[in-house]
């Protein structure tokens, strides 16, 4: 009888694990805290080797062809003049298409939304997940794929083991391309654009539309603006429109209107005109604070972590989805190679902890190479 596996977290990493493990013969259920699912929340992603590997493994390599290619990289100065060009094409795949494709591979009966985990407890021969609605579920193995604010992580590393804020955050916008002013379209479209200044770094590129479309007029422009903030400044920004403090991010529509207006004004003051226009075109900007987290363990008893629940790397690496795919592969192989669950989890941890630590360190090196440590 195959072990019963409960995956807490139904985003990309949880889906990768669910598909690989269920196809390997394991009894897998996914629980996801969101009320309506996660469709439409992603932008573009740079597909690393592990992403192509999992697409090939599952037989859906066609998903890798749904993307928008930036034909060159450009670097702007404050006057909006191109000061450097690199002929390095890069394709941004559709997060939404990738998510929907993997979500469709998990039966609805095995993917339950509106299930918010409250705590995870070890049992003598497994683990037990307690949910906010009062019900509990037990499994032979619980996998925490619940992201940066992981509840499952506490069962592995303790309540005091939390990601560390690195001193800056990313403002983001995802604008239908037809709503971007022509000035910005002429300068930015079909390119991967950058502008750096002390304490500030912005980049932008086209990504597929929410439906995965790559047709002209149906794509979106994705901009990402890194800004330095003290912990006190960040705390004030992360008070959402209802006055609730969010520890890591604010989703679109949750930013207070006066802060959105301030962001547009600061963009006009500090950014090249094309980027300032792109920022102003986003009616619902959102923000993610940036954190590091690199523990020595990702397993305790019958509880294992993966993805951002296990290690949090800075987004400069563009390896978040690839890291989750690598974790899913390693976990499946360990469980197939070692019938004993404890030995399997020990093997999984031994393989993936060094990888996670290396990716976090890589993100830290990339962060030091920017101007974000200079206000």
Show where each model-derived region lies.
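Conserved Rossmann-like nucleotide-cofactor binding loop
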Residues: 13, 36, 149
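Conserved mid-domain beta->alpha element of the FAD-binding
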Residues: 7-23, 27-29, 143-144, 171, ...
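Histidine-centered metal-chelating micro-motifs
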Residues: 150, 170, 201-203, 310-311
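Conserved FAD/dinucleotide-binding core of flavoprotein oxidoreductases
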Residues: 85-88, 94, 99, 180-278
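C-terminal domain-closing interface element
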Residues: 369-375
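Flavin (primarily FAD) cofactor-binding/catalytic cores of flavoenzymes
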Residues: 114-119, 129-135, 268-281, 286
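Conserved acidic E/D residue at the C-terminus of a beta-strand in Rossmann-like folds
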Residues: 30-34
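Conserved N-terminal helical subregion
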Residues: 1-5, 22, 40, 46-178
